[in-house]
């Protein structure tokens, strides 16, 4: 689950109270227990730099490091049907990019206060996930 700009991976529990909300939903029988992984989306090439956030680098980190580590530790079963991804605001951009580039990894998606920018990486001739030429790939991902 990806947070919004200026927040961190702990914002879901400190500000959003996700742990309390999810515990209550489980207790009421509205959802089944699951493991929620929250990563820090404020990823840059160099720590403390004034450079823009690098959503491509975050996507690579999620796919190559975070998901395999979580799979190993919590044994989700390694299947798309056992994984989903969600994001708030800036995290919705990161979620959209990741699910569009890796539809084989996720079966569920949540976009909260979301937006999709065509010019996300400063390339007006590319779509929201960096593909060229621009096409409505973000809509295709929801089919």
Give the ranges of each region predicted by the language model.
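Non-catalytic cap/lid and distal C-terminal segments of serine-dependent acyl enzymes
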Residues: 1-143
């Amino acid at each position: 689950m990806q947070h919004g700009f200026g927040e961190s991976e702990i914002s879901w529990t400190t500000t959003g109270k996700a742990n309390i909300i999810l515990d209550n939903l489980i207790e009421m029988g509205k959802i089944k227990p699951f493991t929620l992984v929250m990563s820090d989306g404020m990823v840059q090439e160099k720590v403390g730099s004034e450079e823009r956030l690098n959503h491509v680098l975050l996507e690579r980190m999620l796919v190559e490091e975070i998901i395999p580590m979580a799979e190993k530790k919590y044994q989700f079963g390694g299947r798309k049907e056992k994984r989903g991804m969600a994001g708030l605001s800036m995290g919705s951009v990161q979620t959209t990019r990741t699910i569009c580039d890796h539809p084989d990894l996720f079966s569920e998606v949540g976009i909260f206060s979301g937006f999709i920018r065509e010019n996300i990486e400063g390339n007006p001739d590319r779509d929201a996930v960096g593909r060229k030429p621009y096409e409505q790939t973000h809509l295709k991902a929801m089919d």
